[in-house]
Amino acid sequence: MIIYKNTNNYLDFTGFEAGVLVNPNYLFEFIKDDDGTKTYCIGVDISANKVKHNLCLIVEKNSPIFTNGEVYLLQGFYLVNIYEQANGSTNLDPTGLTKVETKKLRVIDTAMPTNKEYNGYTKTQNVYNG
């Protein structure tokens, strides 16, 4: 999974298979690979066919409201634990919740890298007339 900074992101997973609740909200636990920092947010499943896959909108922004599917993440790699909880819940603590999936995530900047073009090569062609 990939999250781009300062944009709306759709995270696709299969939480229905391991879940036990009907029409749950999902608690996302983001654990940064390099330092173990944990960040949480709640996502609402917006997929049309929840039996096949689940789709949650997660907005990456600087001043998030974690209970509205918003999160602030630094660039890098994360382990994401996804838990189900009762619809309408604003709980940001995974204790006692059912984990439905674990995924890897990369957070990257939305700015496109600058391509540098090299023009120092010879533009003449040598032809052998043998």
Locate each region found by the language model.
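Beta-strand-rich interaction surfaces with strong enrichment in secreted/lumenal proteins
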Residues: 1, 42-46, 68-69
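N-terminal "first-domain core" detector
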Residues: 1-37
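A structural detector for beta-sheet-dominated domains
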Residues: 14-16, 31, 60, 83, ...
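Short, aromatic- and glycine-rich surface loops/edge beta-strands on solvent-exposed regions
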Residues: 26-29, 72-88
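Short, surface-exposed beta-strand/loop "edge" segments at domain boundaries and coil↔beta transitions
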Residues: 35-39, 64-66, 87-92
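Solvent-exposed serine/threonine-rich low-complexity stretches and specific carbohydrate-binding patches
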Residues: 37-53
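Signal that preferentially marks extracellular ectodomain short beta-strand elements
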Residues: 55-75
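Short beta-strand elements
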Residues: 86-130
